Amino acid sequence: NTRLALNDHDSNSGMNLLRHALAPLGRDSAFFAEVHISGGHLRSLAMVAAGEVELTSVDAVTFGYLQLHAPERLDGLRVLGRSAPSPALPLITSLHWSAAQRRELFEALNLTLIECPHLAATLALKSFLPAGEEHYRILLDYERQAQGWGYPQLR
């Protein structure tokens, strides 16, 4: 009779990675008595804390920021496990930007982190790295694997 809160059906950390973790265990089974769409990770965590649901899945960035800056929002909660690895959220810009413009952006962002260590610490960032579609293919692989195991959506 476990109830789940996920922020949205198109969430990587809130849905895709959890589905991938559960899919090989259930194979065509429903894991949850209820699945609630919360609209965001903070709301999902609040739903668990309030007893509205028993489980949610949030990204490590959100959880880490809360540990550092709002630990009271994690009162009464604990981490049960971790998902398969996933790339970080991408920075997105226009298709019309040149390679030089993209390089300049990364240089400026990384220089800012070096020159403003307090900002880097607040954001919990060490550096910005360029990434391409190939870095995110693993997420589609996770989706396909879950579908292949008969678990196309959390239920």
Task: Tell where the protein language model's regions lie, with residue ranges.
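Generic non-transmembrane alpha-helical segments
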Residues: 108-118
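A ligand-binding cleft/hinge motif common to bilobed small-molecule-binding domains
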Residues: 24, 49, 54-74
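Tryptophan-rich aromatic "cage" segments
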Residues: 145-155
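Bilobed "Venus flytrap"/periplasmic-binding protein-like clamshell domains
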Residues: 1-45, 134
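Periplasmic-binding protein-like
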Residues: 71-107, 120-142
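Short, charged, surface-exposed secondary-structure boundary motifs
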Residues: 16-17, 66, 88-92
